Amino acid sequence: TTLYKLYQNAFTPWEWQPELKHIAEEEGLICFSSPFDKTSVDFLEAMDVPAYKIASFEITDIPLIEYVASKMKPVIISTGIATYEDIEGAIAACKRVGNDQIALLKCTSSYPAPVALANLRTIPDMRERFKLPVGLSDHTMSSSVAIASVALGARILEKHFILDRGDRKSVV
């Protein structure tokens, strides 16, 4: 599978974004998104999103991270299978452009992720190592992992879920 095919299956159509943001705001929620290129950053800037999330498979795209960080909004970086060096590089990219509004998400890159692979002890380790707020990108089919992550210091929760088990494209 190429990254192009992955993006084709994973992206939220641009024409949905303004309505999703409007509905989120009506519900008192903060709506932001993961851009995959500079064009999508510009699109999201035009919508005045308050923050950005860097998807785990973009953590080594330093030019993209610098461009996102240059908007001087909070940047939430999902770590997936990244090495500590990859994470340090992404953090440095944000700081290089003067943005220190950074948080990290501990992420198990498996869909769905087995609870046994959650490795939540990584959360306090990342918080200590990087001196940043750390959260969880939870791909498990359970709510227990997210709850346990808060006990271990998670400050942000991203929960993936499936709207329709018969439709693999309904993962949110």
Give names to the regions the model predicted.
Residues T1-V172:
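Catalytic cores and adjacent flexible loops of soluble metabolic enzymes
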